[in-house]
Amino acid sequence: MSAVERLVVVGGGGFGRELIGHILDVHRAGGGPAAGGYLDDGGSDVLARLGYDLPWIGSIADYVPRDGDLFALGIGSPEGKRQVVEKLQARGARFAQVIHPTALVTARTSIGEGVVLGPFTGTGTETRIGRFVTVNSYSGFGHDSEAGEFTTLSAHVDVMGFAKIGSGVFIGSHASIMPNVKVGDDAKIGAGAIVYRSVPAGATAYAPPAKLLKRR
């Protein structure tokens, strides 16, 4: 990314702000430029009101990429990612991978366009990560596992060996996908779930919620 004129973060919400920090960490480690601006349909006040000095350069709905722009996808929702990427790519946008300097990535990992690997994430040998997959802090993939495009892993998710995650899947924090399990496209896995059996496309699987045993 050293020859890129400007790295633009797409989205100024919670994950977009986290991504700005990840990009700064990459920059400080000598791996690429700092963010040069952001896009958000909420206008220029989205980050300014929180004290950020990163310039707002336009809305996602209207911005037309210029020569040298490279985009980093700061959106967590699988469906939101898909919609935004389709809009921007139709106008010629190119997307960067953002791989945090603390991520442990094996040499035999395949990583697609627009993937974000957050702090202390990891991959095993023969891992395949599709386009625009988001992997939040402390999440990891075992050997021979895969995740399809636009999938999102929240923090502390464990995808074990030979597990296959489809496209557009959302996995909540501290969930574990056991070895050889398949999760179908557009499924949702709740926080803390331990997935022993395959999950059909479009289904939702979740762990029992905490129960109140005693009141004061």
What function would you assign to each model-found segment?
Residues S77-R131, V135-S145, V157-V159, A163, ...:
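Left-handed beta-helix
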Residues G12, S137, E149, S154-R216:
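Glycine-rich hexapeptide-repeat left-handed beta-helix
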Residues G12, D40-D41, H100, P208:
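Cofactor-binding loop segments of dinucleotide-utilizing enzymes, especially the Rossmann-like FAD-
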Residues G43-L104:
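Phosphate-bearing ligand-interacting subdomains
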Residues V4-I23:
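Glycine-rich adenosine-cofactor-binding loop
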Residues V26-A48:
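NAD(P)-binding Rossmann-fold cofactor-contacting core
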Residues I23-H27, L88:
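Active-site catalytic pocket residues across diverse enzymes, especially alpha/beta-hydrolases
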Residues V9-V10, L39, G74:
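Short hydrophobic segments within beta-strands
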